[in-house]
Regions:
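Conserved core segment of the aminotransferase class I/II
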Residues: 3-72
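Short beta-strand segments
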Residues: 6, 20-22, 96, 102-106, ...
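Short, solvent-exposed loop/turn elements at beta->coil junctions and helix N-caps
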Residues: 7-9, 91-92, 130-135
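Conserved glycine-rich beta-strand-loop-beta hairpin in the small C-terminal domain of fold type I
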Residues: 65-79, 91-106
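Helix N-cap motif at beta-to-alpha junctions
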Residues: 108-112, 151-153
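PLP-dependent enzyme catalytic core of the Aspartate aminotransferase-like
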Residues: 121, 136-158
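Residue-level detector of anion-binding/catalytic polar loops
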Residues: 125
Length: 158
């Protein structure tokens, strides 16, 4: 059973994007049965708005290229800071994103909540420690999601 999900939620309208599922025909038929009884109806106006905006796959690619141009410098800056300040100290590791909107950062066990609290004291807004986990319950208190998309490049440099 393999399902792949996608969404335009962070691409177009936060919380109002359209979603898609890629799976086998059998899985698709199964999920269609479930969704039929779980929702009153799809937001067809919103679907039309997205179809008209993107037009085709080339429209999606062009829009994503604009996103990349805006956020790539921010991700490169954060990557450089992490490399310069953290890598040699052995106090954390991270996954360099290949798309998406977050760095997955893993601090030493038991430190994530404290790191996020210290960042807040310094005036830096962070995603809550453990946010990738259900109910933010990270058993090791080590995972922080770094989202450099919101602040300006100048703010990130500070």
């Amino acid at each position: 059973m393999v399902f792949e999900f996608c969404s335009t939620s962070k691409v177009t309208f936060p919380g109002a994007g359209v979603a898609g599922i890629c799976t086998s025909e059998k899985n698709r038929e199964d999920i269609k049965k479930r969704l039929t009884i779980q929702t009153i109806g799809h937001d067809k106006i919103n679907q039309l708005r997205h179809a008209r905006f993107f037009k085709d796959v080339d429209g999606i690619k062009a829009h994503m290229a604009k996103h990349a141009a805006l956020i790539r410098p921010k991700f490169e800056l954060v990557e450089n800071i992490l490399t310069d300040e953290i890598a040699s100290r052995g106090i954390g590791t991270w996954v360099k994103p290949l798309g998406g909107y977050f760095f997955g950062f893993e601090a030493l066990s038991g430190c994530a909540k404290e790191i996020v609290a210290k960042c807040k004291e310094a005036g830096v807004t962070m995603t809550g420690a453990g946010s990738p986990f259900p109910y933010k319950k990270d058993p090791d208190d080590s995972v922080i999601r770094i989202a450099p998309t919101y602040p300006s490049l100048d703010e990130l440099k500070k």
